[in-house]
């Protein structure tokens, strides 16, 4: 902005373009995401994520994740990962490949703010409402899970990390297991940090942690939507 103002004093003819560029730089991030546009693009998402209790059968039967209330930055990064093949799920990859970067940003903005009409969101305490057993507490400490996902697992240190408190236990378990998979073109997630963490645990331990995290209150929810709008 300082450069633009100096330009204005030196040459009035250059002032307008310079100021326009400066303002565009300041407002570009805000306009990159359009929640209203995302709502209009969500038709392909509703069939799974807009139905309470909807289950997917690949790679095993589990509830699809709740995404309403999730961090926009994380949703967008997840869609990009499916598109690039870093996350391997045939259905999600096909959907992601059909989306532009703008589509992903709009959908992410929509789902981050998506809530049930007329219902105010409850404030989630900064400390876990339910304390884990000694065994589960030791497992969580071993992986330093709270250092990224937050002490209450609902307030991660960065929007690129997911809120996981209250997420479906069976989904969390399947998602965690997927980081153990290597060399499979249809199943698995490429994330070096998560892969290193998850490989420390047995499947029984992953299930125990998933059940505890799912028992916690959080912002995630399923907002039922009609396919016909």
Name these PLM-found stretches.
Residues 1-12:
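N-terminal secretory signal peptides that target proteins for export/translocation
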Residues 28-32:
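Sec/Tat signal peptide C-region and signal peptidase I cleavage site
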Residues 33-55, 125-153, 225-229:
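Sequence/structural segment immediately N-terminal to covalent heme-attachment motifs in c-type
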Residues 39, 53-82, 93-98, 138, ...:
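Gly/Gly-Pro-rich "capping" loops immediately C-terminal to redox-active cysteine motifs
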């Amino acid at each position: 902005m300082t450069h633009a103002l100096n330009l204005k004093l030196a040459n009035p003819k250059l002032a307008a373009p310079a100021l326009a560029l400066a303002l565009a730089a300041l407002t570009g991030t805000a306009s990159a995401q359009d929640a209203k546009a995302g709502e209009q693009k969500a038709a392909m998402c509703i069939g799974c994520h807009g139905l309470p209790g909807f289950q997917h059968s690949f790679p095993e039967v589990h509830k699809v994740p709740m995404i309403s209330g999730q961090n926009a930055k994380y949703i967008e990064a997840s869609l990009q990962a499916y598109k690039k093949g870093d996350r391997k799920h045939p259905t999600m990859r096909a959907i992601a490949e059909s989306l532009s970067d703008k589509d992903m940003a709009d959908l992410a903005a929509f789902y981050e703010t998506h809530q049930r009409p007329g219902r105010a969101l409850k404030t989630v305490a900064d400390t876990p409402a339910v304390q884990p057993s000694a065994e589960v507490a030791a497992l969580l400490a071993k992986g330093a899970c709270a250092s990224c996902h937050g002490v209450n697992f609902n307030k991660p240190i960065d929007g690129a990390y997911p809120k996981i408190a209250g997420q479906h236990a069976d989904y969390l378990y399947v998602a965690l297991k997927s980081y153990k998979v290597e060399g499979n073109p249809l199943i698995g997630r490429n994330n070096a940090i998560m892969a290193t963490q998850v490989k420390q645990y047995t499947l029984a331990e992953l299930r125990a942690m998933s059940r505890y995290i799912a028992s916690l209150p959080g912002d995630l929810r399923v907002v039922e939507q009609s396919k016909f709008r």
